[in-house]
Amino acid sequence: MKKRKSRTEVKAVAQYIHMSAHKARRVVDQIRGRSYEETLMILELMPYRASYPIFKLVYSAAANANHNMGFNEADSFISKAEVNEGVIVKKLNPQARGRSYTIKRSTCHITIVLKDRTKKEPTSILERRYGWVDEYKIKYSR
C-alpha cells in the first residue's frame, strides 16, 4: 500500500556526507523537536564539524517548505531528525616495501522533517483520502 504525502510536513535528505554517523547523531540529538529559528541559533554556535552540513540541510528543508507548501519558517519545527550509516569508502594507502593498507572513510545519510504548527492533520478518512469533506456526509454519518 502506497503512503500518501502529508500536507503538513516537508522532508530534506542529505546523502553520502563524509562523516561518522555517531558524530552526526551527537548534533542531531540536540535539535530534535526544536523550532526552526532556535535550531539555526544552536547550530551556528556549536563547535562540531557536523553542525555545518546539518545547518545547510535544515535551511534547505525550510526553503522547500516555504516554496513547495507555503509554510512560514517561524511556525516550523523539527518533528523528525535521523542519521543513518551510509557506505564505507575504502582507499589504499601505499606503505613501504610494496605493501598497502586500507583507509576506511565512513559516510552517513541525514534526514530532517519539518512540520508546521499552524496546519492541522486531516482527521476523517474522507478528508485524508480526498482532501475535502462533504457537508451531507458529516450530517448523516452518525
From Swiss-Prot:
SUPFAM superfamilies referenced in this protein's UniProt entry, alphabetically: Ribosomal protein L22
Compartment list: Plastid, Chloroplast
Disulfide partners: none
Keywords, in A-Z order: Chloroplast, Plastid, Ribonucleoprotein, Ribosomal protein, RNA-binding, rRNA-binding
InterPro entries associated with the record: Ribosomal_uL22, Ribosomal_uL22_bac/chlpt-type, Ribosomal_uL22_bac/org-type, Ribosomal_uL22_sf
Annotated GO CC locations: chloroplast; large ribosomal subunit
Main location: plastid
Molecular-function annotations in GO: rRNA binding; structural constituent of ribosome
Pfam families named in the record: Ribosomal_L22 (PF00237)
GO biological process, one term: translation
Signal sequence bounds: none
Record family assignment: Belongs to the universal ribosomal protein uL22 family.
Subunit relationships: Part of the 50S ribosomal subunit.
Job of this protein: This protein binds specifically to 23S rRNA.
Protein's name according to its UniProt entry: Large ribosomal subunit protein uL22c
UniProt source species: Ceratophyllum demersum
Gene name as annotated: rpl22
